[in-house]
Amino acid sequence: MTERTYLAIDLKSFYASVECMERSLDPMTPILVVADASRTEKTICLAVSPSLKAYGIPGRARLFEVVQKVKEANLKRQRNAPGYRFTGASSSSVELENNPGLAIGYLIAPPRMAHYMEHSTRIYSVYLKHVAPDDIHVYSIDEVLIDATSYLKRENITAKDLAMRIILDVLRTTGITATAGIGPNLYLAKIAMDIYAKHVQPDENGVRIAELDEMKYRQLMWTHRPLTDFWRVGKGYEKKLESIGLYTMGDIARCSLGAPTDLYNEDTLYDLFGVNAELLIDHAWGWEPCTIADIKAYKPEASSVGSGQVLECPYDFVRTRLVVREMADQLALSLVESRLVTRQIVLTVGYDIENLTDKTRSKAYHGEVKVDRYGRKIPKHAHGTANLPRYTSSSVQLMDAVTELFERIADKNLLVRRLNLTAGNVLTESAAQKEEAVEQLDLFSLSPTSQEKRAEEEKKLVRERKRQEAMLAIKRKYGKNAILKGMNLQEGATAKDRNGKIGGHKA
């Protein structure tokens, strides 16, 4: 088997860098956060600039965390200011470094997702000048994975040379710098980029390039903490592993070597994670058999379509029901647009912390309590599934099903903050027709009354389908808000506002 070489390239603080360039600022020096300040300070920041990260602010902080961290940094800074007083403020890290009498200020840039997508498309066209599309996997809006094997041999260059060539071309074209990881498999390339590159000194353009092979990975990464820094290891995995005394990738690798009679062995991991333990063990050793060709060829056996939203403020039962119906309606249109159908709806309702912080509400609640990622106590979320009698993309049928499901699983007395709605068991319309063609009929379904009822139902579905397709045509031509339903204009409805967003952020 041919040894392969992969590159992982991540555009540095992409959203923040785009906003800096739009203001004719060097992306490395301004103190800037991309966030919708028109919402509450609980809003999630889409990105923070490298200079702002230097104050201990993570990339996906909430706006109030930025405010708090900057306030703390200014208190420390004031102790060293001449006369213990600030003479002004600046959002430039260069000015702040040269003048201790300035307070830390910061710019807030509202998100512009459509604009960022245009920039991402431009940058992808730069990649295509160096690499064929078959050798690129777009991992996210600001990250790609590249199989560089054939290019290194053909052009007689190193992987670092190719990575630098691509990154400098992006820098010249857009002004945005990047970080790269190099490895013999996709996993090691990504870990080199995500973790190891952070310890590499940047060059004069702010570029960091790091390289890992299996042995170097084991030497450098086996003791690295936290585990959540590693690809595909989330808080849940970390918590389970730490509960049995495994804190590092080295611990996981050693665990996998244990004999059946040992306290720790691979069965310990399989008991915790099922078949996913195999991937975890492979990654602990720095192995990854999947190639970009495999990714390109992959077709999922089953699929789902869904959406979620965080409400801008806590919603009561009645207003939440309206939003759930809006989500079901939008889900139906998404299915129609993709020529898909479903026969299963899955709904998750996440409750607000006010249910436990408000004394009156807290006394009235006697259910299970969970702790969220911020360490706050909240009522346990509600979760349920509704199976439909047949495959459908009907807005009427999906709204009726999700309304019934919501009323069945949601606590009428609790305030809601998060909603997730998913259509499961999704098939193409043609595949569903074939499956339903062999549906077993019973004696009652053959009666004249039953057949007439079914024929009338089919007519209604055909009429509704024509309305849905007409709505989609209008939305495509004139915008998502060009045609709305009455419920979208009711108090508390969110669809109209969400139509102007991409990924929950302003377009």
Annotate each PLM feature:
Residues 404, 408-465, 470-473:
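C-terminal hydrophobic structural anchor segments
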Residues 12-14, 38-40, 352-356, 426-429:
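Short, charged/polar surface micro-motifs in flexible loops or helix N-caps
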Residues 184-187, 282-283, 341-353, 415-427, ...:
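A glycine-rich phosphate-binding loop feature that marks nucleotide/adenosyl-phosphate handling sites
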Residues 8, 229, 235-416, 436:
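DNA-contacting surface of Y-family translesion DNA polymerases
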Residues 145, 387, 420:
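Short aromatic/hydrophobic contact patches that present stacked aromatics
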Residues 1-285, 289-292, 443, 449-507:
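Gly/Gly-Pro- and Ser/Thr-rich, intrinsically disordered tail segments characteristic of DNA damage-repair
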